[in-house]
UniProtKB/Swiss-Prot annotation:
CDD domains: NMNAT (cd02165). GO terms for biological process: NAD biosynthetic process. The gene is nadD. Pfam families: CTP_transf_like. It catalyses: nicotinate beta-D-ribonucleotide + ATP + H(+) = deamido-NAD(+) + diphosphate. It is an enzyme of class 2 (transferase). Pathway: Cofactor biosynthesis; NAD(+) biosynthesis; deamido-NAD(+) from nicotinate D-ribonucleotide: step 1/1. This is Probable nicotinate-nucleotide adenylyltransferase. Keywords: ATP-binding, NAD, Nucleotide-binding, Nucleotidyltransferase, Pyridine nucleotide biosynthesis, Transferase. It comes from the Bacteria. SUPFAM superfamilies: Nucleotidylyl transferase. It comes from Syntrophotalea carbinolica (strain DSM 2380 / NBRC 103641 / GraBd1) (Pelobacter carbinolicus).
Length: 218
């Protein structure tokens, strides 16, 4: 099975996350997208101290009507920070026969050099880099850390990097929806509508459980 993997804090999950997942699934012909809420993100603070259980439940609500999407609590089942390389190693144990496609944004691609054990990522998975329309990456090899550049060759016709392991890095321009979790949290705190920014099931969960209401208004 070709399995797409999309991680994040999902605080909360919204329509931009879902649209990226759907476009990658379709264009890469994936069988399923697995959403992985981060338990303890290594590079950012978790705004609002929203428990993992709530963020996991919101993802479940968001994807409930899509049989091609699934969510896992994998990162909450282990101790320590939610490093992607460790998550992928655990997923490899759970799905030994599947072909992985790890979905990240262009900003994350540019900062791979600060990720824990980043060279190991390319041994574990293919990468799909989602970029905004009109912002193609002309020289994606040069954006990688110098220490691993020689492990890749650039296929200009396919617009992808090929790693010595056989895995690839695919670059896709995706529909850009200017929606952020931060803005949604601010709207809730200000008592304003968040309708149509996220699935109705997530909206109802937020209001039913009183999430984000105590955050600083801005």
């Amino acid at each position: 099975m070709k399995l797409g993997i999309l991680g994040g804090t999902f605080n909360p999950i919204h329509s931009a996350h879902l649209r990226i997942a759907e476009e990658v699934r379709e264009r890469c012909r994936l069988d399923r997208i697995l959403f992985i809420p981060a338990a303890t993100p290594p590079h950012k603070e978790l705004a609002g101290e929203i428990p993992f259980a709530d963020r996991h439940a919101m993802v479940a609500a968001a994807i409930a009507d899509n049989p091609d999407f699934a969510v896992t609590d994998l990162e909450n089942r282990r101790a320590g920070k939610s490093y992607s390389v460790h998550t992928l190693e655990l997923l490899r144990q759970e799905y030994p026969r599947d072909e992985f496609y790890f979905i990240i944004g262009m900003d994350s691609y540019r900062s791979l050099g600060i990720w824990k054990d980043f060279p190991r990522l390319f041994e574990l998975t293919n990468l799909v880099v989602a970029a905004r329309p009109g912002s193609p990456c002309d020289d994606p090899l040069r954006l990688l850390p110098v220490v691993i550049q020689e492990q890749f060759c650039y296929d200009e016709n396919a617009h992808m990097l090929r790693h010595q392991s056989g895995h690839v890095v695919i670059f896709l321009e995706e529909t850009f929806l200017d929606i952020s979790s931060t803005h949604i949290r601010q709207l809730v705190a200000a008592g304003r509508s968040i309708r149509y920014l996220l699935p109705s099931g997530v909206e109802h969960y937020i209001y039913r459980h009183g999430l984000y209401r105590s955050q600083e208004r801005s």
